Amino acid sequence: MAEILKSACPLNCWDSCGFHVTVENDKIIKVEGDPSHPITKGKICGRGRMLETRTNSPERLLHPLKKVNGEFKPITWNQALDEIAFNLKEIKDLYGSTAVLHSHDYANNGILKNLDQRFFNGYGGVTEIYGSLCWGAGIEAQKWDFGDAYGHAPDDVLASKNIVVWGRNVARTNMHFYEKLLEARKNGANIIVIDPLFNATAKIADKYISVKPGMDGILAAGIMKEVLRLGLEDREFIKLHTQGFHDVEKLVDSLTIEKISEMTEVSIENIQMLAKVFADRPTSTYMGLGLQRYKNGGNTIRLIDALVAVSGNIGIHGGGANYANLQVGQSFDIGNLTLSGRKTSHRQFSIMKQAEEVLAAVNPEIKMIIVTCGNPLTQLPDSSVVEKAFSSISTLVVVDQFMTDTARLADYILPTTTSFEEEDLYYSSMYHHYVNYGPKLVPAPGEAKSDLWIWTQLAERLGFGDDFTFSRNQWLEMTLQSLADKGITLDTLKERKTLELPVKPIPWSDFQFKTPSGKFEFTATYKGELTLAVPDESKWSNPELAQDFPYNLLTIHPLRSNHSQHYHLFPKAPQLKVEVAENIAADKQLKDGDLVRVWNKRGEVRGSLSILPKAHPNTINIDEGIWKQFGGSVNSLTSSRESDNGLGSTLYDCLVNLEKIT
């Protein structure tokens, strides 16, 4: 008999949805939204629904695999674990533990996925990656400005007179905030969307501003310039609660409004209009992630933060520079899981440059890579170098559910469970502040095992099994210790499924910032002044490159896949689609459906052309995440350069050319 059970979405996404999952005869039948969830209210996206397909897919990896003479052969778990443990011990004895690289990302938001750190710390410490492909530049930027990256509670947008959605297509990536926008608009709020692409969110806006890709920070400086010229700044907030304002005044005086308009390709009239909008408090700003995926990405977020501060929209209802909400994740005792004090050795590679660093590593060289919660061959920039690096080492171990592009390179593949086959807690530090409970609903197929089981077995073989003697419930209780006095326990979560975390709904309302000065820092204490930086690949920084490669390439999040996780589950094999601005199609006499080649000095891809109405001139988009085996990863075109603050990617800082294939 079928049962409908509550669960939660594990995907690394803004919304962290509640689920109703239909289970019959130990099989997932259907995934739908939980109407009782306080934020997601029964609505989920196609990516969440496809978790049923993912769980039941006949392509699931069911047994440990070892590559022998270029072909994968099934082996027992004992053989796989014994051989991997032997290699780990030998590598540590001969070269040191940092000859092992742990390459990982956030394919699953389960809180117990952090136990991988406990294993590697117990092993002695390995080469870890730092930074983020996704949002690292912006997180670091807000730490310089505010001391941390905190966002307003979802309902607070309903207090906004004006709402500026800057580079964030919430209709695609944050659907429950999209619902809030519709409600706010019905209540009379004025919605402005700033984006190079005229997307589904722009369609509900009162005003759409098309901006040159990578020039959002310059636009923010221009708006600030007009706010100051018109005398609309919040002088009291600036005087009492900020540091370095005179540096901002000098900065915006260094460019004329005409030059700013030329660089951003936004009219002076629209810049002046935006200045009045920001000064018409309360105005909330909701930033996306794409606008900081440039060399100047951290500075871009800092300039937008500065604009929000100058206009007096910090710490007030209906305001905020909303980028992330790290106070959600900070509510948990993750340190209880990781045992960071156990490691005796340590080395770090940048997540963006990990391929180059693998190839260049000495003292010690990288001898083994273990990949968890990621598909680096598809998702890392400059994928040809990634393939070379991951093919160059002695042993590659991949923990996954499917034969991804990365798994195909592996020496060992360890089949792991889906979220419905293990118990965990789920949250997102991107939007709302609720934690969801996800019970184990069905048994794992074949011999698939949880990540936790794998780490436990390896730890036992390597002599630190005592660090993994706890039950799954005990692990979860460890993470909730800091919340027990607030009534948030594992028992209450199991009973109620979703609980609100005790975070500040209006961050910085007390104007007590976490910076060294205790103030909002226009000029960061340790990192210095704001600058009017531009992307590395632009006509302003590299005119010769821009002449050969005149088009800005964006690689936005796909509608139907969470990065690379869903493409292989489509009923029809996915095909690479090249979306272009109308002027490109007109200049090159192209039409929908034409086969085109997109290239630069790093690589090329081929796909079917689609014309994007109202997209910013000279802009191309190719959704990220498509696998090499389905036609080529767009990351063969992107650069591994780091952002200005060293913690973000430059995936959108990419010039290309395009031609029709005849």
Residue ranges and their predicted role:
Residues 1-230, 254, 259, 267-268, ...:
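N-terminal export/assembly segments and adjacent metallocofactor-ligating motifs
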Residues 7, 51, 70-74, 105-109, ...:
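Hydrophobic alpha-helical scaffolding
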Residues 29, 128, 234-235, 271, ...:
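Acidic/polar loop patches that form or flank catalytic/metal-binding clefts of enzymes
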Residues 114-182, 187-194, 201-203, 217-221, ...:
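Extended redox/cofactor-interaction regions of prokaryotic respiratory oxidoreductases
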Residues 154, 420-444, 454-455, 459, ...:
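Glycine/threonine-rich phosphate-binding loop and adjacent beta-strand/alpha-helix elements that clamp
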Residues 163, 204-205, 255-258, 286-291, ...:
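Flexible glycine/proline-enriched surface loops and loop-helix/loop-strand junctions
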Residues 223, 243-354, 497:
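Active-site phosphate/pyrophosphate-binding segments
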Residues 445, 451-496, 569-578, 584-662:
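Long, contiguous, secondary-structure-rich segments that constitute the structural scaffold
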